[in-house]
């Protein structure tokens, strides 16, 4: 769910997920879509593509379990869809951490109408 995703992003990046990524670039946030603006925005694009592959669960609502061991996210689910959902969220959180150097405040509240159509997943 969005709750676990936000928690993972906070743990990995140290940033407030809603404030820092809720409307970042063309792809971060609920309404995001379009050609990525930078590596940070590309993380969100790849995350949306990961969600599109899920069948049998709702990425925004369905809760899953994970643990934070030695600064590492460990997904722990028996349900295959929830396990994949957790892995999608884990991947974006790690990607955002790895690309903290590309984070650009000018894209924090980027207006989505200015986004060009992105390549399909």
From Swiss-Prot:
Position of the signal peptide: none
Cellular compartments per GO CC: extracellular region
Site (Hydrophobic membrane-disruption site (MDiS)): 111, 114
Gene Ontology molecular-function annotations: calcium ion binding; calcium-dependent phospholipase A2 activity; phospholipid binding; toxin activity
Site location (Cationic membrane-docking site (MDoS)): 16, 19
Tissue expression pattern: Expressed by the venom gland.
Residue segments, region Important for membrane-damaging activities in eukaryotes and bacteria: 105-117
SS bond partners: 26-115, 28-44, 43-95, 49-121, 50-88, 57-81, 75-86
PANTHER family: PHOSPHOLIPASE A2 FAMILY MEMBER, PHOSPHOLIPASE A2, MEMBRANE ASSOCIATED
This protein's name: Basic phospholipase A2 homolog BnSP-7
Organism: Bothrops pauloensis
């Amino acid at each position: 769910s969005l709750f676990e995703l936000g928690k993972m992003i906070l743990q990995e990046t140290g940033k407030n997920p809603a404030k820092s990524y809720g409307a970042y670039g063309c792809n971060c946030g609920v309404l995001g879509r379009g050609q990525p603006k930078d590596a940070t925005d590309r993380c969100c694009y790849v995350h949306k593509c990961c969600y599109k592959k899920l069948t049998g669960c709702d990425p925004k609502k369905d809760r899953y379990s994970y643990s934070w061991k030695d600064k590492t996210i460990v997904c722990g689910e028996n349900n295959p869809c929830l396990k994949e959902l957790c892995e999608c969220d884990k991947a974006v959180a790690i990607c955002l951490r790895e690309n903290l150097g590309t984070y650009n405040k000018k894209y924090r509240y980027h207006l989505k109408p200015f986004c060009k159509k992105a390549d399909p997943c």
